[in-house]
């Protein structure tokens, strides 16, 4: 029997506000344990939450970017549960009326076709703290993350393969990043994914029993975990067994999923309206203000790069996959850089350097200004493409002007015939045996002089000019 895969994804995205959702404490990642906390985060008696307007701004932008309807009458709810990283014993979230609902996003499949994936809801909530279980037998609680604003985006169960799930996450990450509401860095926990997967016989409308997957710390692991689950569940069903509703985690080392717990029923969180936060309304004017702040999104940028800048579909897709790279490219082209040359450098030498150094484009000293200047001095013959690679490394590590560095470092190409011709004559004088071979008609004897000339100029001779002049002087030599 053949089965159809049914996948839905729940994605938590940390919003990049300066402060937390209900307290004025910094929401910055990476500070010392419990440094970003105050009495609200610790849930001291009598303290009250105050909603951060920037969080609602981000929620509106997310809903608009994901083609969602908005609930204009906003309220929050209490989700009741006890855990050490949740000192209030409840989480402030949204239950029956999320900020956004009934949305969709378009994904591109491997065969070049597109598909719309429905988005059921997007709701705002606060994050919990972090538990760490030490080897000393103690458990430690860090509440820096407590109260960091989240938006949870819940897809419809519209994906039919792990590849579609991967494409959905890629598209979602791009949209969220371009909207400017999160850096969506999975390695820092600002984007977290849970997957729900079930199988059903082809033609059956009713969903099968779903399994929830956790510990998916990269898009690649989401795909691998889902691929394993497809195989595991199919084997159980084909052998006459039944799938249990359970939560499993992905084991990256063994590329399998491991049982965490069996779900015997839906958790009862006893939601009720949050009494400490008043109801409020999102006005049409507020929505339109947020709409005007949304940028051009990846799909539109890709189309423009192809139609207006003459880039290939591949180049346009690579450049727009990351907003930082795309914005860098935009600035470089606006400064007069040739679009194809800027694209080639960003996808070639720049990408290789970043991978080797383990850094991002924001973490190096290269700027659109000095990259364009470097491309300009390649095009005008000041330096060769070979020398440019060395210049780029210097700019990436130290910044500064490309032309200034080249001149100080003595890397300027020699293109003046008045300088090159005497050097060529000296090369002839210093290599009499090679001259004799050339005059006698020995095959390929002329090629040796290219190496002699480049050595004599320490590689600074402009290859095009030098080869032309060398051919000219060799012709004269043969006549004599």
Curated annotation (Swiss-Prot):
Catalytic reactions of this protein: L-glutamyl-tRNA(Gln) + L-glutamine + ATP + H2O = L-glutaminyl-tRNA(Gln) + L-glutamate + ADP + phosphate + H(+); L-aspartyl-tRNA(Asn) + L-glutamine + ATP + H2O = L-asparaginyl-tRNA(Asn) + L-glutamate + ADP + phosphate + 2 H(+)
Claim: Transcription is one of the keywords in the record: no
Presence of the UniProt keyword Protein biosynthesis in the record: yes
PROSITE patterns recorded: GATB
EC id: 6.3.5.-
Domain of life: Bacteria
GO MF annotation, one: glutaminyl-tRNA synthase (glutamine-hydrolyzing) activity
Keyword vocabulary terms for this entry: ATP-binding, Ligase, Nucleotide-binding, Protein biosynthesis
GO biological process terms held by the UniProt record: glutaminyl-tRNAGln biosynthesis via transamidation; translation
PANTHER family the record matches: GLUTAMYL-TRNA GLN AMIDOTRANSFERASE SUBUNIT B MITOCHONDRIAL AND PROKARYOTIC PET112-RELATED (PTHR11659), GLUTAMYL-TRNA(GLN) AMIDOTRANSFERASE SUBUNIT B, MITOCHONDRIAL (PTHR11659:SF0)
Function (record text): Allows the formation of correctly charged Asn-tRNA(Asn) or Gln-tRNA(Gln) through the transamidation of misacylated Asp-tRNA(Asn) or Glu-tRNA(Gln) in organisms which lack either or both of asparaginyl-tRNA or glutaminyl-tRNA synthetases. The reaction takes place in the presence of glutamine and ATP through an activated phospho-Asp-tRNA(Asn) or phospho-Glu-tRNA(Gln).
Subunit description: Heterotrimer of A, B and C subunits.
Family: Belongs to the GatB/GatE family. GatB subfamily.
Protein name (Swiss-Prot/TrEMBL): Aspartyl/glutamyl-tRNA(Asn/Gln) amidotransferase subunit B
């Amino acid at each position: 029997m053949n089965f159809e895969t049914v996948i839905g994804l729940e994605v938590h995205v940390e919003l990049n506000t300066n402060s937390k959702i209900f307290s004025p404490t910094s929401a910055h990642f990476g500070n010392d344990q419990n440094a970003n906390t105050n009495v609200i985060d610790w849930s001291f008696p009598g303290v009250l939450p105050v909603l951060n307007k920037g969080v609602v701004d981000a929620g509106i932008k997310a809903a608009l970017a994901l083609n969602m309807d908005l609930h204009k009458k906003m309220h929050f709810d209490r989700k009741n549960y006890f855990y050490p990283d949740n000192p209030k014993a409840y989480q402030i979230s949204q239950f029956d009326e999320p900020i956004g609902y009934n949305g969709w996003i378009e994904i591109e499949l491997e065969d070049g076709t597109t598909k719309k994936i429905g988005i059921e809801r997007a709701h705002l909530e606060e994050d919990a703290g972090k538990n760490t279980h030490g080897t000393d037998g103690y458990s430690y609680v860090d509440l820096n993350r407590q109260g960091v604003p989240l938006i949870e985006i819940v897809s419809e169960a519209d994906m039919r393969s792990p590849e579609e799930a991967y494409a959905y996450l890629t598209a979602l990450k791009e949209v969220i990043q371009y909207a400017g509401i999160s850096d969506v860095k999975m390695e820092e926990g600002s984007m977290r994914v849970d997957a729900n997967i079930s199988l059903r016989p082809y033609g059956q409308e009713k969903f099968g029993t779903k399994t929830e997957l956790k510990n998916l710390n990269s898009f690649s692991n989401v795909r691998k975990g889902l691929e394993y689950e497809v195989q595991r569940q199919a084997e159980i069903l084909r052998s006459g067994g039944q799938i249990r509703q359970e939560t499993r985690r992905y084991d990256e080392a063994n590329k399998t999923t491991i049982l965490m717990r069996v779900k015997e029923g839906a958790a009862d969180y006893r939601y009720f309206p949050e009494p400490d936060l008043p109801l409020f309304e999102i006005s049409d004017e507020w929505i339109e203000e947020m709409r005007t702040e949304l940028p051009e999104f990846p799909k539109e940028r890709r189309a423009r790069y192809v139609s207006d800048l003459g880039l290939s579909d591949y180049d346009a897709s690579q450049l727009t996959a990351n907003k930082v790279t795309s914005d860098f490219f935009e600035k470089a082209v606006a400064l007069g850089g040739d679009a194809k040359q800027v694209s080639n450098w960003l996808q070639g030498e720049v990408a290789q350097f970043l991978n080797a150094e383990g850094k991002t484009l924001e973490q190096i000293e290269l700027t659109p200004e000095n990259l364009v200047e470097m491309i300009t001095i390649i095009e005008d013959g000041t330096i060769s493409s070979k020398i440019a690679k060395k210049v780029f490394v210097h700019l990436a590590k130290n910044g500064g002007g490309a032309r200034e560095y080249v001149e100080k470092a003595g890397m300027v190409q020699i293109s003046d015939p008045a300088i090159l011709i005497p050097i060529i004559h000296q090369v002839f004088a210093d290599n009499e045996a090679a001259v004799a071979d050339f005059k006698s008609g020995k095959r390929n004897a002329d090629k040796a002089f290219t190496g002699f000339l480049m050595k004599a100029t320490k590689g600074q001779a402009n290859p095009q000019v030098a080869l032309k002049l060398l051919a000219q002087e060799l012709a004269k030599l043969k006549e004599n």
